[in-house]
Amino acid sequence: MNLSIMVQGTASDVGKSVLVAGLCRIFMQDGYRCAPFKSQNMALNSGITPQGEEMGRAQIFQAEAAGIAPDVRMNPVLLKPTSDRKAQVVLMGKVACNMDAVEYHQYKPQLQQQISEVYHSLAREYDVMVLEGAGSPAEINLRDRDIVNMGMAEMADAPVLLVADIDRGGVFASIYGTLALLHPHEKARVKGVIINKFRGDIALLTPGLEQIEALTNVPVLGVMPWLDIDLEDEDGVALQNGKYQDTAEKALDIAVIRLPHIANFTDFNALAAQPDVRLRYVSQLSALGQPDLIILPGSKNTLGDLQWLHHSGLAAALLTLHQRNVPVIGICGGYQMLGKRIIDGVESGLEQMDGLGLLDVETEFAPDKVTTRVSGYCQIGLPGILKNCCDHPLEGYEIHMGVSHLGSAAIPFAQLTLRNGQAEQWVDGAVNGDGSVLGSYIHGLFDSHHFTRALLDSLRQRKGLAAFDGVTVNYAEHKQQQFDILASQMREHIDIDRILKLMKQHQQERAQ
């Protein structure tokens, strides 16, 4: 029988995903075989397993923290919003259907048995399971069909840690209120509280800690300081909170258009980590400025976001800046927008729409989603900003429902050689004649650090700057360093020994 612990929160964005990653890292460092698990994730940031199955990026980076390959069983249900009212339902890595909130709430009981079986199948292979909840367990309107918070804790018979964010204010009320709204048997599962994102003198907080412990009869097991670490976010809340608004002056200014249905903005973390890059997300025309590069990211509603791009004035501004020699890159949905036309009977209900016309490409959406990990290299002889990138290795993954057809004026961007680890030859993406526009389906493209540095040095050259002579960040290594920093901070500020002790005690009680 394995050990387990579940991390729940008083609200969304309190830091559950990061703390789960930290616990996974700690248990891995201490010699345990550990795996993360989240029964249901709602996010547009997703990734692909080595088997070509789609799952939430939060569980992927948690698996990386644990030193294991991502497994779709770690996130059996993924909800990807397609509009304010509907979401695509991905079950065990494959698209099942689209549902609105009412339909999905009615569907949840059918998922419960499958989720339980998947969890226990995974748990049998590991010493420690670290589970993550979603939002808050005190959503009393959803309690009767809960499959992700206390409902999941009961399925796994796992003790619970409750995380609260002090930075947003009202931390003691959020702790007390959450525990007060739980049923007695649910509250009994909560073995400790962690206060997250603290800034200031801990001595000023101590009286409050003593009072909340007395009021709730639940111990506070740690107070985590605000950490300036670079780890991926599972959804767009971080964008809304301005986490990625870099204001420092740096050699290169890169503007990512923040589309209403932006997907996989983690694609650009590797760019933001480079010491000579200022990366910012732009949703208003007045904020676009004069960047050195514009990026159109992926989208879960490509035509809807293309309409928004026109209505916001950003489409016209992008075209004007391109005429003034500002290069443009599109990833996935952004790539499709850069073409001449998009034909769609799948995502938006709109039949077709003209693209921005910067690439000689037409895209037709299809009901079957492509989900695959890919490897290859940048084509030889590409012009413009890609002239220094030729033959550099590329790795990443594709998640899309469209097929793009290149016209005679488009140059293929990449020669791909591996699909989900199997040898295969095909081309990806498109480049215009002067190499000022690139479109690609490869998510995670900028994680390929040799390609990224060559691209950035081309941008520097266009500005009359010398090639960068500092240390280029290898993003894969950078993430591993961030996991170690996180684990070290958690060991310092959280009573990890006590958490492990309560996990073992709970295991013994289960065995009786």
From Swiss-Prot:
Under the heading Gene3D superfamilies, the entry gives: 3.40.50.880, P-loop containing nucleotide triphosphate hydrolases
Q: Does the keyword Kinase apply?
A: no
Pathway in which the depicted protein is active: Cofactor biosynthesis; adenosylcobalamin biosynthesis
Residue span, GATase cobBQ-type domain:
251-451
User: Cross-referenced InterPro entries, in alphabetical order?
Assistant: Class_I_gatase-like (IPR029062), CobQ/CobB/MinD/ParA_Nub-bd_dom (IPR002586), CobQ_GATase1 (IPR033949), CobQ_N (IPR047045), CobQ_synth (IPR004459), GATase_3 (IPR011698), P-loop_NTPase (IPR027417)
Tell me the Gene Ontology biological-process terms attached to this UniProt entry: cobalamin biosynthetic process
Under Pfam families, the record lists: CbiA, GATase_3
Named from the GO MF annotations, one term is: catalytic activity
UniProt cross-references to PROSITE patterns, sorted A to Z: GATASE_COBBQ
Q: Where is the active site?
A: C332, H443
UniProt keywords, alphabetically: Cobalamin biosynthesis, Glutamine amidotransferase
- Please report which protein family the annotation says this sequence is part of: Belongs to the CobB/CobQ family. CobQ subfamily.
Functionally, this protein is described as follows: Catalyzes amidations at positions B, D, E, and G on adenosylcobyrinic A,C-diamide. NH(2) groups are provided by glutamine, and one molecule of ATP is hydrogenolyzed for each amidation.
Q: What is this protein called?
A: Cobyric acid synthase
Please report the organism this UniProt entry assigns to the protein: Yersinia enterocolitica serotype O:8 / biotype 1B (strain NCTC 13174 / 8081)
